Amino acid sequence: MTPLSKIEALLFVAGEDGLSLRQLATLLDIPVTALLQQLEKMAQKYERDDNSALSLLESSKTYKLVTKKDYADLLRQYSKTPINQSLSRASLEVLSIIAYKQPITRIEVDNIRGVNSSSAISKLQAFDLIQEAGKKEVLGRPNLYVTSDYFLDYMGINSLEELPDASSIELKDEEFTLFDNKENEEQISENVKEENEN
């Protein structure tokens, strides 16, 4: 493993939240100055590599892997294609957790599910079912996620108060989602289909 490959692996797993310089330096056990040199090498590597769709983004001293702007239209098209209309079990599970626990960070969702949720969160954002709602005032200031107004339309409700009662539901049971009711799951897929046709 090289320093660059280690950084890449960490940033990939961190997903949308990214990692701060301090977090990366601690995880890699290297000085910040040396880390900055490696990050610069990584940025240049991605910029020069036409066979890579990735780019290194730095914002407020937090680093994350993102796709290059050149791929925006392609990814937008992907998010609207029929092949991507059905939400996976993982995405439905994450959406359920966010609906009942919002505002919530990606790490908190991960802790409930026991697995990384970056991909599911990105997909839910692409469908406009969830959105960022500021940052949690803790170390690293991770993004907070909430359901969107569009989510209410998908569920056929006017407010979150109309969601099924979760008082007796243990969300850590990974088999439970809002969409265990097959009718609801079919409805959300149908709504996605109708939206893409409009």
Swiss-Prot record:
Localization annotation: Cytoplasm
Main function: Participates in chromosomal partition during cell division. May act via the formation of a condensin-like complex containing Smc and ScpA that pull DNA away from mid-cell into both cell halves.
Complexes and interactors: Homodimer. Homodimerization may be required to stabilize the binding of ScpA to the Smc head domains. Component of a cohesin-like complex composed of ScpA, ScpB and the Smc homodimer, in which ScpA and ScpB bind to the head domain of Smc. The presence of the three proteins is required for the association of the complex with DNA.
Domain of life from the UniProt record: Bacteria
GO terms of biological process kind: cell division; chromosome separation; DNA replication
Cellular component per GO, a single term: cytoplasm
Name the record gives this protein: Segregation and condensation protein B
Keywords from the UniProt entry: Cell cycle, Cell division, Chromosome partition, Cytoplasm
Family in the record: Belongs to the ScpB family.
UniProt-listed InterPro entries: ScpB_csome_segregation (IPR005234), WH-like_DNA-bd_sf (IPR036388), WH_DNA-bd_sf (IPR036390)
